[in-house]
Amino acid sequence: SANKSGQNSTVRFQPQAQSVRPVRIAFLTTDATASASEININAMQAWAEVAIVGSDTYGKPVGQLAFDLANSCPDRLRLVTFKTANAAGASDYYDGLAASVRFACAADDTLGAPMGDPADGLTQAALQWINTGACASVISSSVAGQAKTSASGRYPLSRQPSAVERWLPGSQ
């Protein structure tokens, strides 16, 4: 297989007149937060004060490419082919981001409150951290080497799941 390092690139964005320079950014997370979401959180750590609010993330700092097998074979292999890192070089959050972010605030989602409502546990904890710089409760990071299971595999659905149960397994 050919080395693809020649395809690496860096793009620097220029500030725009309407740009904001946030002091703190809170990301609402669950144990199903993975992949591109974790990449964004990890990337922002190099540039801003960041917190995850909710629970520890899944831990997937890698990406995949698809490889089709021979023309007569319908199979496709999806292989882990790259690892992501932020501008500071942080990359090994295989057990979730709680151990690698400076602030990891534990909070529960309040499904009865509208998204963004200060009565919602996640929103409330995020606003507290943004306003004070402190977490009322801290997420305990995963034990190193502990296997994680997919969120969907842990939460069975009822026979006739509501929209909330379908989109947020484990909420029943």
Regions found by a protein language model. Give the residues of each.
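C-terminal "post-core" interaction segments
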Residues: 1-172
